[in-house]
Amino acid sequence: MIVCAAAVLPPATVSAYNILYAEQYYKLYHQNMYQYPQDFRENVWYLERALKRPFVNPLNAMADIDNKLEWRRYRYLFSMHLNLEMVKQYRRWAAEYDKREAYFYNYPWKQANIKSLSIAEQYYQKALYYWDQALTWWARLRDVEYVELKRVQHWEDEYARIRDGDLDYGAIIQEDLNRLLRVRKDFEEMDEDTY
């Protein structure tokens, strides 16, 4: 009976919706980040696409938008926030390859550790690039009159933390890179006598 019904009924069509807007990619990033926080490659993939895509119509924005000023502030805040998320993802990704210390007993894996540090350095450099991008959007925001945007206050908090000097990924990443260079030097100086 079930086989007969399946043969008579037309096949169900499955449709997927197109992902067209920055906010859609951002929501997918958020979902993936909470389910798989260590999947940096996919998290970065979603964020990169969000940075390249247009914004949704103000009616569908992640904040309540009632006028052009709010729309402008929303777009600048969102762009700054996306770049800050890229900084966080690349720093965390770099930490997967970074070695905090060059222990003498790691000499047998000296070359592997040096290679790992090179990968970490590349990710830290990427994080610095996105920090500069975030600062560009932050600077543009200074010229936009403040309006409260409900539902995205944490973006305003990021703006204020940068303004007040409480959030400076440039200095943080520079410390990461300085430590990395010191650790790399320690690994490069290792030989059989230090083991």
Model feature map: region roles:
Residues 1-8:
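Bacterial N-terminal signal peptides
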Residues 64-81, 139-194:
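TPR/TPR-like alpha-solenoid helical repeat scaffolds
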Residues 10-76, 188-195:
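Immediate post-signal-peptide N-terminus of mature secreted/exported proteins
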Residues 31-35, 50-53, 57, 100, ...:
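Surface-exposed polar/charged interaction patches
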Residues 78-81, 85-88, 92, 99, ...:
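"A position-specific structural signal for the A-helix of alpha-solenoid helical repeats
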Residues 83-84, 88-93, 123-141, 166-172:
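Amphipathic alpha-helical coiled-coil segments
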Residues 18, 25, 29, 72, ...:
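Surface positions of alpha-helical coiled-coils, especially the charged/polar e/g heptad sites
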Residues 34-38, 45, 64-71, 95-129, ...:
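Short coil/linker segments at helix-helix boundaries
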